């Protein structure tokens, strides 16, 4: 049985860890609320943008649509992999690592040309050993990425040379559920994992007037805007999922520390009682020998 001093020191250390995990849980909960607010606003915007593109496409010339949306032979892919900047968030990063690795390996096995952009320090750590030869850009601080920075990132890249653009991210469903998701942002699609169905109004026939009256120019501009917004929305989804996963992980850690403290307190009391009993026996034995 461990000494009382050892048990006391261990209890002290676990209480210190418990304070840290409790603070991290509270901070993650506060950050989650902020992330959810940003995500809600982003979903509303991208849904309306999606509706506008759908409406313009419904009245556009088919030859023009073929010209804008027809891609090459689907041989070249750009894949964004979004993960967190820090750990202690359960399986948040490992699930993205597993999903993205399986997908990219399939593309490579099919002789596809694949370029990868890592967003987040953990994404960089994931790709360092797996896909380093395929990496064209690594951004370690994904939390610092704003809409303007995403726009600058997209503008700095020649996306026209890619037939397909994909984004791996953790989709936020609720506080307890986040799942790895693969979203296609090029070519544009009528369905998107970034858009909630209840926000879309695709059945409504909007009567838009354009200036200038150049459908091709407007569609290309909107599609470019959609790529930026979709990537930014995926980052917000990932941020909300990360904060939720970390909050859940810290809550679980708090429960575990409470259980450990209860067990150690019981063990400490038993050891203390045994020590007192031993001392009493020695005192009584000494008195009887006199």
Curated annotation (Swiss-Prot):
Signal peptide (residue range): none
Protein task: Produces ATP from ADP in the presence of a proton gradient across the membrane. The gamma chain is believed to be important in regulating ATPase activity and the flow of protons through the CF(0) complex.
Subcellular location: Cell membrane
CDD domains: F1-ATPase_gamma
Gene of this entry: atpG
InterPro entries registered for this protein in UniProt: ATP_synth_F1_ATPase_gsu, ATP_synth_F1_gsu
GO biological process: proton motive force-driven plasma membrane ATP synthesis
PANTHER family noted in UniProt: ATP SYNTHASE GAMMA CHAIN, ATP SYNTHASE SUBUNIT GAMMA, MITOCHONDRIAL
Protein name from the UniProt record: ATP synthase gamma chain
Membrane topology: Peripheral membrane protein
Cellular component terms (Gene Ontology): plasma membrane; proton-transporting ATP synthase complex
Main location, first listed in the record: membrane
Keyword Oxidoreductase: no
Single GO molecular function: ATP binding
Family statement drawn from the similarity comment of this UniProt entry: Belongs to the ATPase gamma chain family.
